[in-house]
Amino acid sequence: MTSVTLGHLDETLHEATAAAVARVLEAYELEIEYVPATHEALMAHMRNGDIDLFVSAWLPDVDVAYLDPALGMEPLGDLYRPEFGWYLPTAAATGLTSIAELAADGHDVNREIVAAQSVLDRVRQGVAAYNLTEHGFTIAARPDAEAMQYADQAIKAGEPAVIALWQPNFLHYGSTSLTPLLDPKGALGTAQTARMLVRRAVRADLDSDMLDELDELTLGNKVVSALDHAMRVEDMSADAAAEAWQRGKLLPR
């Protein structure tokens, strides 16, 4: 093969991660055609055999639909470990360390939880598991972009607001601005593994050394958060962010 189609969700985090993976493909002199799309469109592309490599499926739960045998894709590698959690801005200095403590009196945490539409079900699970509605908590559903803007402003202002967020994410860049809240009941779900998917029909045609290299490629949550930050905040292209990572200039020292 001299070229591959590389699919990814049409979001900065996934676009930047795909660009990082593409560095390996380019080293084997492959031409790359990117296929950014929605979940539904990507599944249709897979079903039609239009995607050779996909970056990336969050398994075993979030993106399990991609493993439908009819799509013809197989997991490869372990790029990073997505995990959903609740956080408080570190600058708010609330002293709270657990979601369970939100049900107690005497704290000034905002009782309106602004939740992105994409994580609304998980936020509802957390509120229900810890009986937070009985303690005055409500959920305000917002479009993802609006919820991210709210979270960004709350972090910068040091407001005592619950931030419901996956990591990696650009808001985790630097890893010091958010304090995680423990989830002793496991209400928010388990950590995932971000894995590439390779089209079964072309796997035998791909260089075995390249597949081994992809299988061993690990970016980690810090790097992916930094890639996302580079695109969202520093206005870098995905290729520029991936190049900065490759040259060791992406993470703060």
Segments the model singles out, each with a brief description of its role:
Residues 55-69, 153-179:
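A ligand-binding cleft/hinge motif common to bilobed small-molecule-binding domains
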Residues 1-14, 30-35, 110-114, 214:
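Short, well-ordered beta-strand elements
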Residues 72-79, 164, 173-190:
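Short beta-strand->loop
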Residues 12, 134, 144-156, 164, ...:
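An extracytoplasmic/periplasmic, membrane-proximal ligand-sensing/linker region
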Residues 10-12, 33-47, 138-150:
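Short helix-initiation/N-cap motifs at beta->coil->alpha
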Residues 72-120:
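A conserved helix-loop-strand patch within extracytoplasmic ligand-binding domains
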